[in-house]
């Protein structure tokens, strides 16, 4: 049986996922802060800002977490490891974004991967509409 993972990115086209009805055996992976209505099995985080936001807003999702070393340091700093279920810790890789980490992990686990909201792969769009409303970007 083919295993399917849906990686929900942050780009504008992520809304196309709203038309998909996930099957019980599909893995849903969200990147960073997940907007309401998306219920991921796994949340992938590689930066410190989403962890700080969760801490500051008392938001502790019940999904498993795949995190980078940088995010793990932030989880320890905020003493969140008793509230966040970390399932996988990745080495920090320069120029990788959260979506790349998540897709790579799914492929390494043998999943057929469907990507939603990965606009920057196919265009010059670097927008992350949902994330940008929550965490201001200082470099764009």
PLM features: what roles do these ranges have?
Residues 1-140:
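Metal-ion/cofactor- or nucleotide/acyl-coenzyme-handling active-site neighborhoods
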């Amino acid at each position: 049986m083919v295993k399917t993972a849906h990686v929900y990115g942050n780009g504008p086209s992520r809304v196309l996922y709203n038309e998909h009805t996930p099957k019980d055996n599909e893995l849903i992976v969200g990147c960073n802060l997940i907007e309401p209505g998306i219920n991921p099995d796994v949340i992938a985080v590689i930066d410190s800002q989403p962890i700080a936001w969760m801490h500051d807003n008392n938001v502790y999702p019940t999904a498993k977490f795949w995190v980078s070393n940088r995010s793990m340091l932030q989880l320890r700093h905020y003493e969140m490891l008793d509230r966040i279920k970390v399932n996988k810790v990745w080495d920090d890789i320069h120029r990788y974004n959260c979506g790349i980490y998540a897709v790579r992990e799914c492929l390494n686990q043998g999943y057929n991967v469907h990507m939603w909201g990965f606009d920057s792969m196919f265009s010059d769009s670097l927008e992350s509409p949902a994330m940008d409303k929550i965490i201001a970007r200082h470099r764009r």
